[in-house]
């Protein structure tokens, strides 16, 4: 492992001293290591990134999401040093950075392949790069008026309801927006997709888990303005068509997980027992 990328979120408190220390830790483990620094993921999606052996993310969970989308096509593993609020995906705290880098070069880690989503807008020829690690959300616009949705799974009608929106989430995203919408926490290596309605006007409409290979079609039957498509809470697009197709992407996010990190402990400390507001990024 000689080619290391570092992706820095410039909105976070990351001093030059912190970066110098990380350079030092890397070169202590491998004096020949080549380090390339990226800022706010700019240039990370270029073909040259394919040569990277790993990318360290200095930021929070939101920075991990952006990094995952940028690197998805290149199969480059990533891990995060938490400089955000929650640190569920970016699980390494700054004081443990040296130990994590040592374990990285010793090979004392495993790689988790996380499902990603892709989205197609019916009737639009141009294929935009709608990839998501957490979730893809279709919601009403600015008006406080609900929208009528009809859901099809593998071209079979599932249900129709009125609601503020619909979340389609991966297991990774099950601890994000869909959790707030009443969805279950899904163990991250399961091959499933989740549909979670947002504020449905019905007591009988509840989140559902589907086979990971399912194709989900969301049809907008009644609207007062164009709904909005949101990718991982970071990218959005007004939807002028009446149907959105969401399915599992052929790409996966490769997350580096160190052996001393326990998913259930992280779940307890970062989600279950967390009392202060999760501000996110």
Swiss-Prot record:
Broad class of enzyme this protein falls into: transferase
Keyword entries, A-Z: ATP-binding, Cytoplasm, Kinase, NAD, NADP, Nucleotide-binding, Transferase
Enzyme Commission number(s): 2.7.1.23
Pfam families the record matches: NAD_kinase, NAD_kinase_C
Subcellular location: Cytoplasm
One term under GO cellular component: cytoplasm
Biological process per Gene Ontology, one example term: NAD metabolic process
Keyword hit for NADP: yes
GO terms, molecular function: ATP binding; metal ion binding; NAD binding; NAD+ kinase activity
Active site: 61
Chief localisation class: cytoplasm
Cofactor: a divalent metal cation
Annotated binding of NAD(+), by residue: 61-62, 134-135, 145, 164, 175-180, 234
Family stated for the protein in its record: Belongs to the NAD kinase family.
Role: Involved in the regulation of the intracellular balance of NAD and NADP, and is a key enzyme in the biosynthesis of NADP. Catalyzes specifically the phosphorylation on 2'-hydroxyl of the adenosine moiety of NAD to yield NADP.
Protein name from the UniProt record: NAD kinase
Species whose genome carries this gene: Clostridium botulinum (strain Loch Maree / Type A3)
